[in-house]
C-alpha cells in the first residue's frame, strides 16, 4: 500500500510550498537522471503523461523510437530537506514505460521487478537488501572543483579532531533521517577521508531506491561543507578502496528462508543452494557488480576486498560471509560489490545467481575458514578457490558466456551494457597513463 495517496501528495505540496518536482530515474550506468517540472504540472505527472527523449539517455533507445513516459512511484515521494531560493523541491522515483503502456525493458528498475517476479514464482515473498556503501571526502578548490587532497588523515572508527569529516557525516545522517531513512550507524572507515553510513535493510526495489537517494544526499551535503564526495571504488593507490557490501535474505510469508535452527551453521538448504548459485556465477556477475575499469584496482590482495570466490561463516577474506546473526536476521553478505554499480542491475544478477542455485539444488562447496590472502596458489586450487576477474575486460568475457547472467539483464540491457563497457575498456586500454611515462620515458 502506498505511503501517500494522490490526494495526500497534492495537499502536501501546497502546505509545504513545494515549487518544483523532480521525476528521477536511473540510466544503464547507474547515473541518476531527472526531468524537473513546476508544481503546476504535478497533475500531469501523476496521470503518467510526462514524456522525455529516451534517445538522449545512455543505453535506452535509438532516435527513431525516442518517446518514453515517466510513471512516478507514489511510494517514493519525498520533499528534500534543503530549500531552494524560490521554494521547496520534491521528488518521485519513476519507472520508464513505452508509449503503448508496457514497461520499458531497458529500465534497470523495471528489470529488477522482472527478476523479483521470477522469485515469487518459486514461492518466495520478499528479497531484502542491506547495503553498506562507502565513500571518500576530498577538498574542493577555490573554483569548486574536486582536488586530490583528502579531508582528513583518520582511520577506522576515529573521531574528531582526527576525523575531520565528522560534522559533514552528521549532517548527512540528519538529512537522511528527515527523508525517512533509518540510520543504524555511521563511522570513519579504514582509509584517510573514507566514511561509511549504514541504513536499515529493505525490500529489493526500495533498498536500491535508497542507495540512489543516499548517493544524491551525500554528494549534496558534502558540497555544502566545501567537500567532494566520491563513490569511485579506488580513488587512491595504497589505501583501501570503497565497497558496498550487500547483505541478502530471502523470505517466505514473513519467515527467513535462510534460517534453520537444526541445520549445520543454522543455515537452511535454501541458503546453501543460494550460496552455491552465487559461487557458481560470481566470476560472471562481477562485470555488473564491479562495472568500471577502476573497480578492479580495489579487488586486489592486501586491502580487505575479496579477490577469491569462496564463502565462510567466520572470516572476511572470501567473497561471501555469513554474519553471526541468526533467526530473522540470517543473511548472506556478498563483499565484492562496489558503489559504482547500478544497484538495480547488481541486485538483478545477484538474485538471479542465487535463484539458479535454488532451482537446480546446487551444492555449496565447503566453507573456507582460513585467511585466503595467505594461502598459496596451489592451496587455493586444492580447495577449489578461483580468482575473481582481474580486469573489466576479463569480467566482460565471463559475463558474455554465462546464459543465466545474460537472461538476468534481458536482451536490451545486456547488449547496451556490453557495448558501453567495451567502449570504456577500449578507451582505457589505448590511453597513455602517467605511470607509463614515469616508468619508460627515461629508461628508453
From Swiss-Prot:
Record PROSITE patterns: GLNA_1, GLNA_ADENYLATION, GLNA_ATP, GS_BETA_GRASP, GS_CATALYTIC
Residue intervals of the GS beta-grasp domain: 16-101
List of residues binding Mg(2+) 1: 132, 245, 333
Major localisation: cytoplasm
GO molecular function, one term: glutamine synthetase activity
Residues that hold Mg(2+) 2 according to the record: 134, 189, 196
UniProt-reported outcome of changing residue 10 to V: In strain: PCI 219
Protein residues bound to L-glutamate: 240-241, 298, 304, 316, 335
Cofactor notes: Binds 2 Mg(2+) ions per subunit.
Domain GS catalytic: 108-444
KO phenotype (gene knockout): In cells lacking this gene, expression of glnR, tnrA, nasB, nrgAB, gabP and ure genes is derepressed.
SMART domains recorded: Gln-synt_C (SM01230)
Induction of expression: Repressed by GlnR under conditions of nitrogen excess. Repressed by TnrA under conditions of nitrogen limitation.
InterPro entries: Gln_synt_N, Gln_synt_N_sf, Gln_synth/guanido_kin_cat_dom, Gln_synth_cat_dom, Gln_synth_gly_rich_site, Gln_synth_I, Gln_synth_I_adenylation_site, Gln_synth_N_conserv_site
UniProt-reported outcome of changing residue 59 to R: Unable to form stable complex with TnrA. In the presence of glutamine, this mutant derepresses amtB-lacZ fusion and glnRA-lacZ fusion
Effect listed in the UniProt record for changing residue 62 to A: Highly resistant to inhibition by glutamine and AMP. Regulation by TnrA and GlnR is abolished. Only small differences (less than 2-fold) in its steady-state kinetic constants compared with the wild-type
Purpose: Glutamine synthetase (GS) is an unusual multitasking protein that functions as an enzyme, a transcription coregulator, and a chaperone in ammonium assimilation and in the regulation of genes involved in nitrogen metabolism. It catalyzes the ATP-dependent biosynthesis of glutamine from glutamate and ammonia. Feedback-inhibited GlnA interacts with and regulates the activity of the transcriptional regulator TnrA. During nitrogen limitation, TnrA is in its DNA-binding active state and turns on the transcription of genes required for nitrogen assimilation.
Protein name, per record: Glutamine synthetase
Organism listed in the record: Bacillus subtilis (strain 168)
Protein encoded by which gene: glnA
Amino acid at each position: 500500500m502506498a505511503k501517500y495517496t494522490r490526494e495526500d501528495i497534492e495537499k502536501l505540496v501546497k502546505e509545504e510550498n513545494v515549487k518544483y518536482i523532480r521525476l528521477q530515474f536511473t540510466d544503464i550506468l547507474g547515473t541518476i537522471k531527472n526531468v524537473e517540472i513546476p508544481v503546476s504540472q504535478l497533475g500531469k505527472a501523476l496521470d503518467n503523461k510526462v514524456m522525455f527523449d529516451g534517445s538522449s539517455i545512455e543505453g535506452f533507445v535509438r532516435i527513431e523510437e525516442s518517446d518514453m513516459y515517466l510513471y512516478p512511484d507514489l511510494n517514493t515521494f519525498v520533499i528534500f530537506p534543503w530549500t531552494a531560493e524560490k521554494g521547496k523541491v520534491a521528488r518521485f522515483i519513476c519507472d520508464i514505460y513505452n508509449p503503448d503502456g508496457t514497461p520499458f525493458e531497458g529500465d534497470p528498475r523495471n528489470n529488477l521487478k522482472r527478476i523479483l517476479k521470477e522469485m515469487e514464482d518459486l514461492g518466495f515473498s520478499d528479497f531484502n537488501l542491506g547495503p553498506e556503501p562507502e565513500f571518500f571526502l576530498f577538498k574542493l578548490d577555490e573554483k569548486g572543483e574536486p582536488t586530490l587532497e583528502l579531508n582528513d588523515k583518520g582511520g577506522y572508527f576515529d573521531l574528531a579532531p582526527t576525523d575531520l569529516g565528522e560534522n559533514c557525516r552528521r549532517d548527512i545522517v540528519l538529512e537522511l533521517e528527515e527523508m525517512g531513512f533509518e540510520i543504524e550507524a555511521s563511522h570513519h572507515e579504514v582509509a584517510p577521508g573514507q566514511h561509511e553510513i549504514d541504513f536499515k535493510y529493505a525490500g529489493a526495489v526500495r533498498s536500491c531506491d535508497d542507495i540512489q537517494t543516499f548517493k544524491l544526499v551525500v554528494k549534496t551535503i558534502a558540497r555544502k561543507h566545501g567537500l567532494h564526495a566520491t563513490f569511485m571504488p579506488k580513488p587512491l593507490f595504497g589505501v583501501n578502496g570503497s565497497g558496498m557490501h550487500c547483505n541478502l535474505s530471502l523470505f517466505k510469508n514473513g519467515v527467513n528462508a535462510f534460517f534453520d535452527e537444526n541445520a549445520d551453521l543454522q543455515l537452511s538448504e535454501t541458503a546453501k543452494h543460494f550460496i552455491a548459485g552465487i559461487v557458481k556465477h560470481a566470476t560472471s556477475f562481477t562485470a555488473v557488480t564491479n562495472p568500471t575499469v577502476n573497480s578492479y584496482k580495489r579487488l586486489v590482495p592486501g586491502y580487505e576486498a575479496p579477490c577469491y570466490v569462496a564463502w565462510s561463516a567466520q572470516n572476511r577474506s572470501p567473497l561471501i560471509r555469513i554474519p553471526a546473526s541468526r533467526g530473522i536476521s540470517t543473511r548472506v553478505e556478498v563483499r565484492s560489490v562496489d558503489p559504482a554499480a547500478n544497484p538495480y542491475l547488481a541486485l538483478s544478477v545477484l538474485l538471479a545467481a542465487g535463484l539458479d542455485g535454488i532451482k537446480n539444488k546446487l551444492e555449496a562447496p565447503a566453507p573456507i575458514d582460513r585467511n585466503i590472502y595467505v594461502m598459496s596458489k596451489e592451496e587455493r586450487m586444492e580447495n577449489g578457490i578461483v580468482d575473481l576477474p582481474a580486469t573489466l575486460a576479463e569480467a566482460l568475457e565471463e559475463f558474455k558466456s554465462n546464459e543465466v547472467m545474460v537472461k538476468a539483464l534481458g536482451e536490451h540491457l545486456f547488449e547496451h551494457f556490453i557495448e558501453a563497457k567495451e567502449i570504456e575498456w577500449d578507451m582505457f586500454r589505448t590511453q597513455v597513463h602517467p605511470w607509463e611515462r614515469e616508468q619508460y620515458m627515461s629508461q628508453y
